């Protein structure tokens, strides 16, 4: 998510994302999240970056349990200066679990959720639009589209992206 200009800039949306917010890896030791190493990574990146993205593909999100993802979000919010932006990947094949992640992220004060189009099954644009509307209605978390058509098998046009912006409040 490097050099993003902004999340949805709509009335009621005050989030402004700027700068470099790379997806950071999730370190492991003995098959468990290595929070000491993650804290050292934070100490290394905070002077250089405006924030970071947690639980993206590079952050091993598809391999993490829901409890591990939530534990990571809690750790991140406790150990990140308020001046830094935190975006969290909400990738999941189940809308209910994505909603749970989004609501938890919002409660913890995370700034935005990185959301891919539904994946695994082929999508039509109306399906994608309703998916984003449902996630948007369920949470007040700002949503950032993770456009990865190779893996989601969903290619979006500029007009479709604009329709998504119009359809969502966050």
What is each stretch, according to the model?
Residues 166-170:
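Basic phosphate/pyrophosphate-binding loop/patch that engages nucleotide-derived ligands
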